[in-house]
Amino acid sequence: MKIVTTKDNLQILHEDNHLIVVNKRVGDIAQGDNSGDKPLPDIVKEYLKEKYNKPGDVFLGVVHRLDRPTTGIVVFAKTSKALTRMNDLFSSRETQKTYWAVVKNKPPKEEDTLVHYIKRNQQNNTSKAHLKEVPESKKASLHYKIINELDNYFALEIELHTGRHHQIRAQL
């Protein structure tokens, strides 16, 4: 695999006629917010517009997002048909998303499935995990496995069964 880095430090991991896959860096935002920072889709659109010398607006569909303090692979659709197909794959759970996280302090078990009820606080953009259902909470489930450790830090491989707001951060 050849990684292409643009003048804006956009790292392109894959591109074809239908999709463009990029590495989202820590601090990049996957969609616009009130911070005034330029969202990753706008940077990708500028790249496509320049590369293909396209006048006017460039279509770019956001297939999925990652939180600002997270790095990882983000997939964008270059056509509406590709976006529909990718959305169908994600909603029918035909895709597999693997996450890696570093946590301080060892989890109780080497490998486990966690089930909580997550309540989102819109005002401060946080989520809190509860052991029992609380009003306006949503059930959240994930499976983790410790894959490495150093001092009191542990690298986990995580598979989400649900996709809740800040789920990994809230549950672990």
Task: For each feature predicted by the language model, list its residue ranges.
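RNA pseudouridine synthases
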Residues: 1-172
